[in-house]
Design a protein with these regions (language model features):
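Short, surface-exposed loop/turn motifs at beta-strand boundaries within globular domains
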Residues: 12-14, 214, 286, 346
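Active-site-adjacent bridging/hinge elements
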Residues: 125-137, 191-198, 330-331
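Exposed substrate/partner-binding surface patches
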Residues: 1, 7, 19-22, 50-53, ...
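Beta-sheet entry/capping signal
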Residues: 12, 218-220, 290, 352
Length: 400
């Protein structure tokens, strides 16, 4: 066993389970490493101007005062950092708190330079309350306010929130050049490149290439056969759970088949105006390096008056192949390294995670599964990890 647990600060098991999985996600670990120099300069500036002592709602104002009153004495780096802080201080302070916690979660493993082995150090539980406090404060009055109100909440919502904040903390403008032979290439790829440029040229970060990916939606008119195409950026894929699959055990592939099946859609053809029996097909267009799956276990009755939890056992593999759902031709396989489980009922359950520690290369994983249940961390067998009836979210890393 080589991992810190996390204290539960009042129904924060959803957050703890998500943080444990993020802390062993290769894209997240590398994200934290590549910004070390930039972050050192950021912390120095925050310390120099005592911005860390400011309330979150006054930091932007303080940055503006410094820029107005001390501009002549500031270095170019300080000008850039203060300008970024004025624009995105909320996201940046969440990032700083998140990074500090993730580094501590990873600090239970250190390399012995004499024999290149990994030694164990103190594994006392860690407290995520600094991250909880700042996210709660900054979410106040927003659509995310209920996420940090002390009630049982959803790790998927927390992941979507924190990933967006991390992206915003490093978001910048870049020049994205389209190929000179744009009109000669495949039409779908052309549309993808144009959408990518429009969406990310002024909002680009490390996450765009490492955690985000595109899903393509094609709608075909049943009458004139015109095809309308849209591209949607995505970071977490939410897949339905079939109620029955020929009396057999449900697998993750059954869920993916349901997600990516050709279906009818209410749609008015932009070419001929036909509304009847139009078909939609979805596929993954750009290959994600991190493939996070949410199983839609929470469902509503037909009349929509009540919600219930689907407790079906869903079989998931150690190696996931998504070739069938991907537009590319190359083999696309993923390695399972994290699972968020939910036990209990819809209104009174508990979240915990299974994870594999990431190796020092930040690409591969230790083969020992660990159960992280708030402060408690214990070894579990492969059989136990791979047969959880409580599996709710699955974390896969691209095998390159």
């Amino acid at each position: 066993m080589s991992r810190h647990g996390l204290y539960n600060n009042g129904n924060t098991c959803f957050m703890n389970a998500a943080l444990q999985c993020l802390s062993v996600t290769p894209s997240i670990c590398n994200f934290i490493r590549i910004y070390n120099t930039e972050d050192e300069n950021l912390i120095k500036l925050i310390t120099k101007f005592n911005l860390g002592k400011c309330k979150t709602d006054t930091i932007k104002l303080e940055c503006r005062k410094i820029l107005d009153n001390q501009k002549e004495t500031l270095t170019n780096d300080e000008l850039q950092i203060l300008t970024k802080l004025e624009k995105s201080s909320d996201d940046i302070f969440i990032y700083i708190s998140f990074k500090d916690l993730i580094k501590k979660l990873d600090s239970n493993r250190q390399t012995n330079t004499d024999n290149n082995t990994i030694s164990q150090i103190d594994r006392k539980p860690l407290d995520a309350s600094p991250l909880l406090s700042i996210t709660r404060e900054l979410a106040s009055g927003s659509i995310f306010e209920n996420l940090f109100n002390g009630s049982q909440n959803d790790p998927h919502e927390f992941l979507a929130y924190i990933l967006d904040r991390l992206h915003n903390s490093k978001s910048t403008s870049i020049q994205i050049k389209l190929p000179s032979n744009l009109n000669e290439i495949d039409n779908y790829y052309k549309l993808y490149l144009q959408h990518f440029k429009t969406r990310y040229e002024n909002d680009y970060s490390y996450f765009v290439k490492n955690l985000y990916y595109y899903i393509i939606n094609c709608v075909e008119c049943s009458k004139c056969k015109n095809i309308s195409t849209t591209f949607n950026p995505n970071d977490i894929i939410c897949i339905p759970v079939p109620t029955q699959v020929n009396d057999k055990m449900i697998t993750i592939y059954d869920c993916l088949n349901e997600m990516f099946k050709t279906d009818t859609i209410v749609y008015t053809c932009e070419n001929c105006g036909n509304k009847d029996k139009n078909l939609i097909e979805n596929k993954i267009f750009s290959k994600p390096k991190t493939f996070i799956i949410k199983l839609k276990r929470y469902s509503s009755t037909l009349n929509g008056r009540s919600t219930f939890k689907l407790n079906n056992m869903i079989c998931y593999p150690d190696i996931l192949n998504i070739n069938k759902y991907f537009c590319g031709k190359a083999e696309t396989n993923y390695k399972l390294y994290g699972i968020i489980n939910h036990s209990g009922s819809l209104n009174g359950g508990h979240y915990y995670s299974y994870v594999k520690n990431i190796n020092p290369d930040y690409k591969t994983f230790n083969e020992q599964w660990l159960c992280c249940n708030d402060t408690q961390v214990s070894n579990i067998s492969d059989e136990q990890a791979m047969a959880s009836q409580n599996a709710y979210m699955l974390f896969y890393s691209l095998i390159e």
